[in-house]
Structures are given as C-alpha cells and as structure tokens.
UniProtKB/Swiss-Prot annotation:
Any one of the GO CC terms: cytoplasm
Gene name, Swiss-Prot/TrEMBL: tilS
Pfam families on file: ATP_bind_3, TilS
Enzyme class, spelled out: ligase
Protein name in the entry: tRNA(Ile)-lysidine synthase
Binding residue positions for ATP: 43-48
Known catalytic reactions: cytidine(34) in tRNA(Ile2) + L-lysine + ATP = lysidine(34) in tRNA(Ile2) + AMP + diphosphate + H(+)
Organism: Bordetella bronchiseptica (strain ATCC BAA-588 / NCTC 13252 / RB50)
Family: Belongs to the tRNA(Ile)-lysidine synthase family.
Amino acid sequence: MSTSTAAPAPSLSDLCPAALRRPVAAALRALDPAPARLAVAVSGGADSAMLAVAAAAALPPGCTLRLFHVHHGLQAAADQWAAQVRGLGALLGVPVDEARVTVPPGQGLGMEAAARLARYQALAGLARQHGVRHILLAHHRNDQAETVLLRLLRGTGLQGMAAMAPLSERDGVAYLRPWLDVDRAAILALAGAVRAQCGWQAVQDPTNTDPRYARAAVRTQLAPALDARWPGWQAIVARHARQMAEAAEIVAEVARADFDTLEPADAGRSFSLAAWRGLSAARQAQALRHWLASQDAPMPTEARLAELQRQLRQLHALGHDRHLRWQHAGRVVRCERGRVWIDD
C-alpha cells in the first residue's frame, strides 16, 4: 500500500517573482567590489518587507543579509511594527537590528523631513555598528512619480527633477534603490502571497494616507485624478526623472569643466573673478553651484544665487579695494585682489 506525502510549502524566497527579484540581483551585480554584507531598511510596511524577501531570494553567494529597523516612536503601534519586522526576520532566517530614535521638534524642518533625517542617521549608525556599506531601500515607481510631482510643485530645479537615484551615498553608506522602475501593484501582490503562505501581514502606517502630510496629499488626492485621466502616468513621470538625471549629469560635467578654467586654488576655495566673468550668464550660475557644492556649502535659493551673481558682475565698478562679503548659512563669500573666496 503506497502513501503520498504532501509537497513541502515553498519558502518566502520561492514566492518572489522574477520581476521583483531580478532588479535586486542586477543592482547587486553592478557593485564593484561585491559586498560581503548587505542590509535592507525595513519599516514593517509592505514595500520594505517584500524588498527583504526579494533580497533574500537574490542574495549572491558569500554575502550575508541583515534587516535594519528604525523605531521612531511616532505612532502608537510602533512597538508592534518592530515586532512584525522581527517576525519577518525569523521567517527569512535573517538577523534584525533595531535603532530607537527620538524625532526632535523644530530645527526648521517639518515632521516628515525631521523623521527622514533621524532615520538616515540611525541607519548610518547601524551600518557602522555591523560593518555594512550597502543598504537597500524599497522606493518604487509610484514613490518616484510622487517625488517628482512634489518637487515640481515646490519649484525644484533640474537636479531636483531627477528625483531619487538608483544609487546614492550618504554618511559613508551606499543606498541602493533597485525598484524605481517597479510598479507597486507587483509588490502588493507578493505581500498577499506571503500573507496567504505564512500569515505574516505588513503594517499600515496611517501617515501614508493622512492628507495633512504633503506626500500623502499627493497620493490620496492628486494621484487618483491622474489615474483616472492618464492611466500609467507613474511610468511616464519616472521616465521623465531618468531623463532629467541624464541632463543634470551633463550640466554638472560642464560646470566642473568650466570651474577648472577659473584658475582654482587653495583646494578650490578660490577662483579668478575675471575668468568667471568670461562665462555666459547660465554657465556662471552653474559654476557657482558647483563651487558651493564642492565646498560643502548649502545650496542657496535661485534668488539668493542670482544676487551673488549680480554682485560679482558689478564688482568692477567698485574697485579692488572694496571687498564683497556675501553671507550664506554661516559661510562668507568675499572678493579680494581679483579672486573670489569662500570662508567658514
């Protein structure tokens, strides 16, 4: 008499479709040298949790994976979210590391921006603690489209319209966003499959649908109207962001090349005023932006930069004995003996 044995249930990694696994694998293959340690920033929501599943499925040989969770304490259910992340780590067989932060009020930042700053600082701390150089973030095509709309409405420039980059560095950590061309519907489908398989359910952040927050207002009020009139608009806007990123890179290359002709000295702290005046107005502005960024100075508004540009153009009428002193964010730009300097 023969007996039949039920097939073993698939692991969570087996549930991950190629459309979600392949972008992660491609992002990891592009890293040189290949990382020995990798982390996923996991809030407990569907997006970051499913990225953890995809990362476990795409993890190359010789690389270890960790989940980093930042506990903000901003929501009553924050402890439950942390528990959900620990549960996901147990299902994946992956260690979970938690950092608790307090989001300070004020600092001239809104709550969204302050929480984001605290989160990045906490992630950098966890990365240093565990020797991790690369962290995966779960931003997807819908997030990218929302970012472009928000920045457009806030009057951003070319660099801002490029929105989120697939790879960026901050505080010594490389952040990878492999899903910027992935629609969220595919992520939610995997979350549903995971829930059906093992009962693990993603947490719901109420701020994601609270229109008091700018991004949530775009998501709940503007996006539905665009969905109805222009289905698939997120892909179009995300493509626009990629094109803006290419354009911004070209502008940056021109600005670097122009600045190199300005006789820079003292580690780039000064340049020739006469050489700068030989540039067109648009290239003067880009050279100034490049210079300020290279000196770790906060980027001024368009109006403030135009004022600096105007003053530099008019210096010839003041004579060499009259020194420009343009103050910005604790830094001072001055002109002396035909050279423009920036001081702390």
